[in-house]
Curated annotation (Swiss-Prot):
This is ConoCAP. Changing residue 91 to A: No change of activity of conoCAP-a. Changing residue 87 to A: Complete loss of activity of conoCAP-a. The gene is conoCAP. Residues 22-48, 63-82, 98-160, 177-207 form a propeptide.
C-alpha cells in the first residue's frame, strides 16, 4: 500500500527540482566544488556579495541553511570545501580566482600620502631601534665598569642598593647609594658624639 507521503513526494518532486536548480547559492557552491579546470572558467564579475564566510564551507548567503538540506528533498549534499584563505565583503578568493575582477573596492589606487606616511613611520622606527641599541650598549659598558669597580675593595665604599627607582631621575647607572643627599650628614652626625646625643634626645631615643 502506497502511503500519502510517497504520493506527495512524487507530486512535489518535479516542482522542487527547478527550485533547486535556480538556487544561486547552490550554483555558487557547485562552481566552487568543481575541479580547477572547470573552476577557472567561472566569471569573477558575477560574484555577488556574500553575507557569511567561514573556513569549512566557503561563503554562504541567505540560503545557507536551505542548501544544507538532504538529497531526498531535492538538494544535493554539500561537499567538504577547502578553507578559503581570504574573505571580504565581495566574497572568498583563492589562487584560482583573481582579485582583478573583485570590484572597485580592491582596484582603488593607493593614496600617495599614505606611502609617505608609511616611509616616515619606518624611518622613525629605525631611528628608535638604533637609539635603543646604542643605549643598551652604553648600559652594558657601564655595568662592566661598575663590575670592575666593585671588585676593588677600596672602591666598593658604602654603596647600597636604591629602594625606589622611577622615571623621574631615579636609578641611572651611577653610584647607587641609599638616600645619597643625606648620607654625608648622617655620617657626620654618627662621628660627632655630642651631635648624636642631641639627635637621640630630640627623637626620644636612648643611646
Amino acid at each position: 500500500m502506497v502511503s500519502l507521503g510517497h504520493v506527495l513526494f512524487v507530486i512535489l518532486l518535479p516542482v522542487l527540482l527547478p527550485v533547486a536548480a535556480d538556487d544561486p547559492d547552490d550554483q555558487m557552491l557547485s562552481q566552487i566544488s568543481l575541479p580547477s579546470s572547470s573552476r577557472s572558467e567561472y566569471d569573477d564579475n558575477d560574484v555577488s556579495k556574500r553575507v557569511f564566510c567561514n573556513g569549512f564551507t566557503g561563503c554562504g548567503g541567505r540560503h545557507r541553511d536551505r542548501s544544507r538540506r538532504q538529497e531526498r528533498y531535492g538538494k544535493r549534499l554539500i561537499p567538504v570545501l577547502a578553507k578559503r584563505p581570504f574573505c571580504n565583503s565581495f566574497g572568498c578568493y583563492n589562487g584560482k580566482r583573481s582579485l582583478s575582477g573583485a570590484g572597485p573596492a580592491l582596484s582603488t589606487p593607493v593614496d600617495p600620502s599614505r606611502n609617505n606616511k608609511a616611509r616616515t613611520m619606518a624611518r622613525m622606527l629605525d631611528a628608535a631601534a638604533s637609539a635603543r641599541h646604542e643605549q643598551q650598549q652604553q648600559l652594558l659598558q657601564q655595568r662592566e665598569q661598575r663590575g670592575l669597580e666593585s671588585r676593588d675593595p677600596a672602591a666598593s665604599g658604602d654603596l647600597s642598593k636604591r629602594l625606589f627607582c622611577n622615571g623621574y631621575g631615579g636609578c641611572r647607572g651611577g653610584k647607587r647609594t641609599l638616600y645619597s643627599p643625606w648620607l654625608e650628614r648622617m655620617n657626620e652626625v654618627a662621628d660627632d658624639r655630642s651631635a648624636r646625643n642631641a639627635l637621640c634626645t630630640r627623637l626620644g631615643w636612648r643611646e
